[in-house]
A protein has these predicted regions:
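Positively charged, small/polar-rich N-terminal and surface patches that mediate targeting and assembly
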Residues: 1-112
């Protein structure tokens, strides 16, 4: 199993979720996060005063998939979340040692 962590622009969430459903990915976790990379924040004007926003709001998606589904999941997120502009996000893939569905005690691939 793999844990796929994707950091994307918030307005891309629905499109990414729908695309993942289309390839059979049934669940994901979403968290609101803030961060910076090459984008390095931006300036905004509020009530006539300019403010520097150091951290950019993003969404973090966490998806556990079977090994056989990892490449297609990453490819789908990348294709759908891409705008071609700085700040599109990142995708990380890490191994998952075990999974357990609490309600049924199903384990590993059966639990996801």
């Amino acid at each position: 199993m793999k844990l796929i962590i994707a950091v994307i622009k918030p307005f891309k969430l629905e499109e990414v979720r729908d695309a993942l459903k289309d390839i059979g990915i049934q669940g994901l976790m979403v968290s609101e996060v803030k961060g910076y990379g090459r984008q390095d924040g931006h300036s905004e004007v509020y009530r006539g005063a300019e403010y520097t926003v150091s951290f950019v709001p993003k969404l973090k998606l966490e998806i556990v998939v079977a090994d056989k589904d990892a490449s297609k999941t990453v490819e789908t997120i990348s294709e759908v979340a891409k705008t071609g502009k700085i700040g599109d996000g990142k995708i990380f893939v890490t191994p998952v040692e075990a999974a357990l569905r609490i309600r049924t005690d199903e384990k590993n691939d059966d639990a996801i």
